[in-house]
A protein has these predicted regions:
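Glycine- and charge-enriched loop/helix tracts that form the active or gating conduit
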Residues: 1-157, 161, 165-183, 187-206
Length: 208
């Protein structure tokens, strides 16, 4: 994947194109045939990350939603990490990176764990959809309406992506038992609620 014109000009004119390039690489990749962004374009993304400050949260969220309904969204978040974009788009996710060690005891690397969980959720959901085992439940005119679900649930995937973001704030080392992350789920829920103030739909699905 490359830009038709000079990448610095392309990305500076509309910085959302940087995130869109990552989305295209993710959506078009298969295990047998991965798509990649050419090195020149990747380097340009890193150089132009400061331009992302002009983007609205809504435009970024729209691209992230499209990434999350792909089969292997971990590709996108790995590319965001590689270019430095993750700190601009989802700093809470970037803070999961790394392993701290005390007395020779470390904890699991939570960033790679999160991406593995996300891809597994996507794989299992897509398998269940293909087999017709997922349904939508609605109330219409006081009647129950149940329909077979044919599309991915983006909120399920957001939950998988953000399920451990409370771990850095809750991390403690106990010489008796090792590393703990007590109440990380509640801390993470509050982080989501605080960052999504004003977006009632997202909070209903995620923070609650």
């Amino acid at each position: 994947i490359r830009t038709p014109l000079d990448p610095d000009t392309t990305y500076s004119d509309d910085p959302l194109r940087m995130l869109r390039a990552i989305r295209f690489a993710t959506k078009l990749s298969t295990p047998e045939r991965p798509f990649r962004i050419v090195d020149e374009s990747l380097a340009s993304i890193t150089r132009n990350l400061h331009r992302m400050q002009i983007l609205s949260k809504e435009r970024i969220a729209e691209e992230l939603n499209k990434i999350l309904v792909s089969s292997r969204p971990s590709i996108a978040f790995s590319l965001m990490d590689k270019t430095g974009m993750l700190e601009y788009v989802l700093p809470e996710l970037a803070h999961l990176k790394g392993v701290e060690t005390q007395e020779g005891r470390g904890h699991k690397e939570n960033f790679s764990h999160t991406l593995m969980v996300l891809d597994n959720v996507c794989r299992l959901e897509e398998k269940a959809i293909a087999e017709g085992r997922l349904c939508n439940y609605d109330i219409v005119d006081n009647h129950e309406v149940i329909t077979v679900r044919t599309e991915p649930n983006v909120w399920l995937r957001w939950a998988a992506l953000l399920h451990d973001i409370g771990k850095p704030a809750s991390k403690r080392y106990d010489p008796q038992i090792g590393w703990t992350f007590h109440s990380h789920e509640f801390i993470g829920g509050k982080m989501i609620y605080d960052s999504l103030k004003g977006d009632d739909d997202a909070n209903v699905h995620l923070a609650d």
